[in-house]
Amino acid sequence: MSTLKKPDLSDPKLRAKLAKGMGHNYYGEPAWPNDLLYIFPVVILGTIACVVGLAVLDPAMLGDKANPFATPLEILPEWYLYPVFQILRVVPNKLLGIALQTLIPLGLMILPFIENVNKFSNPFRRPIAMSVFLFGTFLTIYLGIGACLPIDKSLTLGLF
């Protein structure tokens, strides 16, 4: 199946539109000059206006003065490392924690071979890939929230 839509030039209505110069809207707008000269600058200037507006309305406050001799009670990594930190913190054997983290890329490499019989690209028609994605997303969010809590409340998220 081709991704290009070819015009049916035997259609008299389409030939009449093309004769009047009205046919390009039927197949899509040209990128030059419509997108590059009109739409892109509006999006770029709008993004800059949003960033400047947020910086003016809610400036970043300065935190406490740095003291190299005072160590905080609990040192947390950057936010994108919270799930990894939680795995290493909860698993009793650190080697097992590292092995669990190597299973994630291995599972992602195996997933296309499990789902190769499915020819659909729509994610709602690929139940295995969708369920693995949703499970991984919820597990990552769960581990990330648990990393922000004390160790005794991290597995139950303080709910029980």
From Swiss-Prot:
GO terms for cellular component: plasma membrane-derived thylakoid membrane. The keyword Transmembrane applies. CDD domains: cytochrome_b_C (cd00290). It is found in: Cellular thylakoid membrane. InterPro entries: Cyt_b/b6_C (IPR005798), Cyt_b/b6_C_sf (IPR036150), Cyt_b6/f_cplx_suIV (IPR005870), Cytochrome_b_C_euk/bac (IPR048260). Its main location: membrane. The keyword Mitochondrion does not apply. It is a multi-pass membrane protein. GO terms for molecular function: electron transporter, transferring electrons within cytochrome b6/f complex of photosystem II activity; electron transporter, transferring electrons within the cyclic electron transport pathway of photosynthesis activity; ubiquinol-cytochrome-c reductase activity. The chain crosses the membrane at residues 36-56, 95-115, 128-148. Coiled coil: none annotated. One of its GO terms (biological process) is photosynthetic electron transport chain. It holds the Pfam family Cytochrom_B_C. Keywords: Electron transport, Membrane, Photosynthesis, Thylakoid, Transmembrane, Transmembrane helix, Transport. Component of the cytochrome b6-f complex, which mediates electron transfer between photosystem II (PSII) and photosystem I (PSI), cyclic electron flow around PSI, and state transitions. The 4 large subunits of the cytochrome b6-f complex are cytochrome b6, subunit IV (17 kDa polypeptide, PetD), cytochrome f and the Rieske protein, while the 4 small subunits are PetG, PetL, PetM and PetN. The complex functions as a dimer. Belongs to the cytochrome b family. PetD subfamily. This is Cytochrome b6-f complex subunit 4. It comes from Prochlorococcus marinus (strain MIT 9301). The gene is petD.
